[in-house]
């Protein structure tokens, strides 16, 4: 006789009184799914009625399955069965946790188990964000719908976006999650770990040896290690991908959706990018509230009802999801829809670096500017696209006194300047060190001189013999309007720490690098070295 994959531990009838008049009756089944190596994955099954069949919402989480009960009850009321599971090595599940490694194997075993259950009607959809979203991507070819929020299918793009190591994201999350429950590590220890050299022993000094963080540091390039975690473009059914302009997964999430669109092209798939981030914002801005930005939970529920149950087809015509690509324009506080990325409606316009640090329409007089980049005093990242506290838009004025930057500004705007896409820079630079980093920071100067970050980006560059070398930089994408009375501010520097690790200017592998060198950076602009910024401008429709 075939051995059953899961064994029922106990079965509960639950009465939840939401209000004095409203009682929700459901059945909670405590079960387990057996995966490779006879490891048992703790699994909760929520059923409206055990004698009927339902479409299934699958949630696999490293953050304790019981924390999803409120959402599970909400979905029960909408006519779903809900399966919530602790990931391998987390909370009630057996085995050892290694970030991202086992999610496809364990997810496939779980889907096979669901399909054998008498309460399953043939449909299984994924739901969730962040790591829970990744567990969907890992098995997206076996799901009838994917509902993923601020997540990534390609983990290399998350840990090494643009080839730069996501120090704060990796350490903030990786140290905390590397335990069966969650590690209560103090913020002081985490902050200290950012400065530790070599980075490969920062985990030992902070808490304990962390296998997956050590492996991340060892594999700086997109090699077979990262390919094994890459599930980009595999979805067969409709996908709702909700991203944030200040989210750590933004760059990857856009590429994830582009890949799905190219391979799959499902008419029900949608990408929404709103003014959101992966943690509490530093500078509060409601951008007009949910009436303007959209209610993410409601959008996901209607998307699932439309694509899994055949209801609410009007979700595809809403102001937030009416196009394949839907972009919230911050400070304009409305959505712009397109059928492509980059949007064909965007025009690229060049602005040259000019004398007196002004952005000009044509190359100005020849100028050279220098600064010293010292890894012992790296340029601080304030807000932006990282995981932690005080993320997203943040006041940048404390950085204005720093000497390790070149700053260029537009004239005061008399009409709106609307950015939608990537701000790129074509620069002529030199460095006293052969291997270094350059960053581009895009910012908004308000009429009261408050400076807010719009977006950032950068990369490692190689400079031979300190000669003027043309490099290309790109910010992460943004959707942002600078309003009349504001100024566009562009900063070129060599750090954004601790969002990214310090480049030590030696070219050593970051796993073992200890030696620190100071670099003298030079930028050239003018007719012979036409350094420029290219803006993706979206003009208002007449």
Q: What residues fall within each predicted segment?
A:
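Glycine/threonine-rich phosphate-binding loop and adjacent beta-strand/alpha-helix elements that clamp
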Residues: 27, 32, 296, 311-542
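Accessory cap/linker subdomain of secreted extracellular hydrolases
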Residues: 77, 141-234
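Active-site-adjacent alpha-helix of alpha/beta-hydrolase-fold enzymes
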Residues: 251-269
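Cap/lid segment of the alpha/beta-hydrolase catalytic domain
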Residues: 50-115, 283-288, 402, 440, ...
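Alpha/beta-hydrolase fold nucleophile elbow
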Residues: 119-130
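Short glycine-enriched nucleophile-adjacent loop
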Residues: 132-142
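N-terminal cap/lid segment of alpha/beta-hydrolase-fold proteins
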Residues: 21-50, 409, 413-415
């Amino acid at each position: 006789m075939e051995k059953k994959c899961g064994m029922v531990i106990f079965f509960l009838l639950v009465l939840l009184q939401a209000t004095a008049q409203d009682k929700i009756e459901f059945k909670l089944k405590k079960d387990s799914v057996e995966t490779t190596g006879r490891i048992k994955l703790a699994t909760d099954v929520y059923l409206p009625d055990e004698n009927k069949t339902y479409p299934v919402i699958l949630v696999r989480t490293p953050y304790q399955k019981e924390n999803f009960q409120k959402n599970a009850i909400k979905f029960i009321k909408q006519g779903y069965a809900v399966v919530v599971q602790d990931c391998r090595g987390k909370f009630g599940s057996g085995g050892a946790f290694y970030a991202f490694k086992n999610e496809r194997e364990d997810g496939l075993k779980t889907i096979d188990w669901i399909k054998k259950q008498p309460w399953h009607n043939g449909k299984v959809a994924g739901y969730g964000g962040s790591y829970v979203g990744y567990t969907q991507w890992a098995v997206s070819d076996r799901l009838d719908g994917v509902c993923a929020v601020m997540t990534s299918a390609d983990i290399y793009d998350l840990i090494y976006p643009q080839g730069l190591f996501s120090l704060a994201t990796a350490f903030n999350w990786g140290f905390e999650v590397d335990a069966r429950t969650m590690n209560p590590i103090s913020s002081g220890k985490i902050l200290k770990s950012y400065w530790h050299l070599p980075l490969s022993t920062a985990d030992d000094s902070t808490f304990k040896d962390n296998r997956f963080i050590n492996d991340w540091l060892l594999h700086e390039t997109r090699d077979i290690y990262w390919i094994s975690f890459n599930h980009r473009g595999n979805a067969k059914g409709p996908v709702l991908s909700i991203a944030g302009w200040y989210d750590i997964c933004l760059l990857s999430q856009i590429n994830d959706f582009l890949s799905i669109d190219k391979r799959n092209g499902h008419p029900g798939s949608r990408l929404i990018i709103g003014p959101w981030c992966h943690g509490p914002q530093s500078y509060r801005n409601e951008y007009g509230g949910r009436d303007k930005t959209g209610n993410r939970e409601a959008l996901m529920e209607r998307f699932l009802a439309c694509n899994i149950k055949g209801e609410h087809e009007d979700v595809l015509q809403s102001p937030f999801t009416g196009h394949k690509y839907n972009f919230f324009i911050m400070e304009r506080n409305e959505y712009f829809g397109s059928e492509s990325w980059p949007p064909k409606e965007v025009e690229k316009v060049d602005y040259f670096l000019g004398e007196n640090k002004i952005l000009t329409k044509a190359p100005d007089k020849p100028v050279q500017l220098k600064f010293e980049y010292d890894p012992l005093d790296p340029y601080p990242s304030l807000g932006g696209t990282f995981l932690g506290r005080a993320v997203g838009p943040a006041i940048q004025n404390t950085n204005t006194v720093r000497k390790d930057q070149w700053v260029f500004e537009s004239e005061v705007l008399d009409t709106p300047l609307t950015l939608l896409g990537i701000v790129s820079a074509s620069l002529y630079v030199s460095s006293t060190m052969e291997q270094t980093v350059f960053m581009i920071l895009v910012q908004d100067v308000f009429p009261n001189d408050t400076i807010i970050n719009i977006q950032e980006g950068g990369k490692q560059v190689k400079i031979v013999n300190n000669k003027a070398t043309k490099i290309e930089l790109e910010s992460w994408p943004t959707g942002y309007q600078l309003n009349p009375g504001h100024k566009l501010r562009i900063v070129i520097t060599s750090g954004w720490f601790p969002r990214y690790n310090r480049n030590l200017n030696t070219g050593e592998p970051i796993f073992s690098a200890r030696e620190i060198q100071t670099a003298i950076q030079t930028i050239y602009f003018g007719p012979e070295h036409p350094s420029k910024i290219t803006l993706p401008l979206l003009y208002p429709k007449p």
